[in-house]
UniProtKB/Swiss-Prot annotation:
Keywords: Acyltransferase, Transferase. Catalyzes the conversion of butyryl-CoA through butyryl phosphate to butyrate. The keyword Transferase applies. This is Phosphate butyryltransferase. GO terms for biological process: butyrate metabolic process. The keyword Lipid biosynthesis does not apply. The gene is ptb.
């Protein structure tokens, strides 16, 4: 079981190196992350985009392109679709967003002919390695699903479990996070949490243990759980935090990023291959960590 990103990177040494297709690769921060990933055997890469601009950026950041496959496609929409094709056809194992707007990128991901649709819910999973914490924290969904309904939450849990399994956590503990740790029929998130816990009890959601509802404190702190009399195998020990909506999840994501000493990475799952969808504000390290996470998920998918 990996407890931090150093241990996650060590896990990659045990699997064949995976290949990432970068859509519209003429993006300096993305190419810097790709350089780091390839130099440390985290992943190999196929760069799809404007070849001249890619070479100009590579020269600026001292990136030797001699070992890279480059597909010269100047139009961003065509380049993005070609990168998706590389993944759906098996020539690459994962997809990464470069210098292309998110809407165009996702349209290609969802393309009916060559896209990465599976019929499952797509969701974002962030993984945090917080200094002083004894385990990784998996957070969903801070980027993709806005106001998930109950059926969406089932899909979000299943997707987060896939990532947790890839990180070596065989039976992750899942906590649906709510304002309070008791069922209140005026708070739909608490009702959903109780239903999810019952589905877990009956084996309807597999590969994990779900309990709830939980307030954040008694989901992650055994001391807080004990103080409030909250018991069970998940209380104070949660690995996966299912937030009720994107507002709560995004605030928590940014709180952990800016108010704690932590490392993180994230990816889009529910697709036929992992998708790395970082933002312009994400750090260099976050981009590299996201590539590593995607490589682990891709290795488990094979």
């Amino acid at each position: 079981m990996s407890k931090n990103f150093d241990e996650l990177l060590s896990r990659l040494k045990e699997v064949p190196t995976k290949k990432v297709a970068v859509a519209v690769a003429q993006d300096e921060p993305v190419l810097e992350a790709i350089k780091e990933a390839t130099e440390n055997n985290i992943a190999q890469a196929i760069l799809v985009g404007d070849k001249q601009q890619i070479h100009e950026i590579a020269k600026k950041i001292n990136l030797d392109l001699s070992d890279y496959e480059i597909m010269d496609i100047k139009d961003p929409k065509k380049a993005t679709l070609e990168a998706v094709k590389l993944v759906s056809s098996g020539h690459a194992d994962m997809l990464m967003k470069g210098l292309v707007d998110t809407a165009t990128f996702l349209r290609s991901v969802l393309n009916k002919e060559v896209g990465l649709r599976t019929g499952k819910l797509m969701s974002h999973v962030a993984v945090f390695d917080v200094e002083g914490w004894d385990r990784l924290l998996f957070l969903t969904d801070a980027a993709f699903n806005t106001y998930p309904e109950f059926k969406d939450k089932v899909g979000m849990i299943n997707n987060a479990v896939v990532v947790a399994h890839a990180c070596g956590i065989d039976v992750p503990r899942v906590a649906p996070i709510c304002p309070v740790e008791v069922v209140n029929t005026s708070m739909q998130s608490t009702v959903d949490a109780a239903l999810l816990a019952k589905m877990s009890d009956r084996g309807q959601i597999k590969g994990c243990v779900i309990d709830g509802p939980f307030a954040l404190d008694n989901a992650i702190s055994e001391e807080a759980a004990h103080h409030k009399g909250v018991t069970g195998s998940v209380a104070g020990k949660a690995d996966i935090l299912l937030l009720p909506n994107i507002e709560a999840a995004n605030v928590m994501y940014k709180t952990l990023t800016y108010f704690s000493k932590s490392r993180n990475g994230g990816l889009l799952v529910g697709t036929s291959a992992p998708v790395i969808l970082t933002s312009r504000a994400d750090s260099f390290e976050t981009k590299v960590n996201s590539i590593a996470l995607a490589a682990l998920v891709a290795a488990r998918n094979k």
